[in-house]
Amino acid sequence: MGRVLVTIFVLFWPIGSFAAINLDRIVAVVNEDIVLESELEQMVRTVQDQLAAQGTSLPPGYVLERQVLERLVMEQLQLQLAARTGIQVGDETLNEALGRIAQDNGLTLSQFRNVLEQDGYDFPAFRENIRKELIISQLHKREVNDRVSVSKAEIDNFLTNQKKRGNQDAQYHLAHILITVPEAASPEQVQAAKAKAEQVLQQLREGADFQKVAVTYSDGQQALEGGDLGWRKMGQLPTLFVDVVPQLQAGDISKLIRSPSGFHIVKLLDYRGEGQQQLVTQTQARHILLRADELASEREVQLRLSQLRQRILSGDDFSELAQAHSDDKASALKGGDLGWVSPGQMIPRFEEAMRSLEPGEISEPFKTQFGWHVVQVLDRRQENMTEEFNRNRAKMEIRQRKVEEELENWLRQLRDEAYVEYRLDN
């Protein structure tokens, strides 16, 4: 299970990160805070290990140092804003997050801690970096995500444009380099950024390694990951890439793409084609729900529900019993009818009970977070949910694209409004 955390994030310091510091030098001032040389050195070593594990050739040390320092500065700025606005992550929330990470790696939290320490990580430091990530995630949600909405008209336009382009399920694996232009930049600053971007593009045209060039020059959020944006469907592409990317062949590099943020270069790493119709198995079901309270214990409720089930098996009408006894008032009015249910609509325990039944069968009483149930499956059918699936997917893809664009603008504004003084040696 070694190196279980390579893909989690690069800000997890190895042991020794928080050791006592003698005459530690300040390498950056970030508003009222500072970044210390020891922090920078530890982060650089961690990023070097990650890039080496990915097989990415390393840029010169001073270049990597400046890229890493910029990431530390941006982290400081976001944590400062979170602190000023009262965002906190308590130990209970933190422990739940750690438990999920351990579970995702197939481990208990205790086993996970042992693996971390065997791989050279200090667990208390790891905990605090997870806390920082959760704080920044909450900040992004409040400042960006919650302010993004998607209208019905946007979904309709998205689907119309997808049909015009064809192959709406095509996916693109992209890498990206951004050379930023400051907010309210002068013509000279714009020209300087463009000249730098053209030099970078020329290096790529001459065969330079894209990942190394991205780590060296890119101002994008994924610079230290070699500019890798991962797999994107058309609707997940930034708006300014939509007309460019479909024209590229795998391995192609785009021309310069101008945006308010600066100059972009995109490489198409790989491509995959269309998907298929979305056919799902729907279940028509009805149920009776009983809840325990101060007048009836869990055992008494379970016994009462067993008696109702036996009455149904003996010939009593399910609908009449549901109307008379069920605590789910919404479905009770319809004789317990839940209609046609698609996968994912019900909680897992309820779906598990439905899956185990053939049409006409009635379950034994079972418990969920809502109380005690008996469920009867009436029928099953295959339903083409492609249109509904496409609309839901369109909404998610539009939202993701808008969030990414807003986040980039928000981070740029946060950086431009901050006081940052670099004290690295030239």
Swiss-Prot record:
Q: Which SUPFAM superfamilies match?
A: FKBP-like, Triger factor/SurA peptide-binding domain-like
Instruction: Enumerate the Pfam families for this protein.
Output: Rotamase, Rotamase_3, SurA_N
Superkingdom of the organism of origin: Bacteria
Span of the secretion signal? 1-19
Q: Name one GO biological process term.
A: Gram-negative-bacterium-type cell outer membrane assembly
- Keywords associated with the record: Chaperone, Isomerase, Periplasm, Repeat, Rotamase, Signal
Query: Where does the PpiC domain start and stop, copy by copy?
Result: 169-270, 280-379
| Main EC class the enzyme belongs to | isomerase
Q: Which InterPro entries match?
A: OMP_Chaperone_SurA, PPIase_dom_sf, PPIase_PpiC, PPIase_PpiC_CS, PPIase_SurA, SurA_N, Trigger_fact/SurA_dom_sf
GO molecular-function term, one example from the UniProt record: unfolded protein binding
* Main localization, broad class: periplasm
Q: Does the keyword GTP-binding apply?
A: no
Catalytic function, reaction form: [protein]-peptidylproline (omega=180) = [protein]-peptidylproline (omega=0)
The record's GO CC annotations read:
outer membrane-bounded periplasmic space
Has the keyword Hydrolase been applied to this entry?
A: no
Question: Where is the protein situated, by its record's location annotation?
Answer: Periplasm
Which Gene3D superfamilies does the UniProt entry name for this protein?
Answer: 3.10.50.40, Porin chaperone SurA, peptide-binding domain
What's the EC number here?
5.2.1.8
User: What does the entry's domain section say?
Assistant: The PPIase activity resides only in the second parvulin domain. The N-terminal region and the C-terminal tail are necessary and sufficient for the chaperone activity of SurA. The PPIase activity is dispensable for SurA to function as a chaperone. The N-terminal region and the C-terminal tail are also required for porin recognition.
Q: Record's PANTHER family?
A: CHAPERONE SURA
What's the stated role of this polypeptide?
Chaperone involved in the correct folding and assembly of outer membrane proteins. Recognizes specific patterns of aromatic residues and the orientation of their side chains, which are found more frequently in integral outer membrane proteins. May act in both early periplasmic and late outer membrane-associated steps of protein maturation.
Name of the protein this chain belongs to: Chaperone SurA
Taxonomic path: Bacteria, Pseudomonadati, Pseudomonadota, Gammaproteobacteria, Chromatiales
What would be the name of the gene that encodes this protein?
Answer: surA
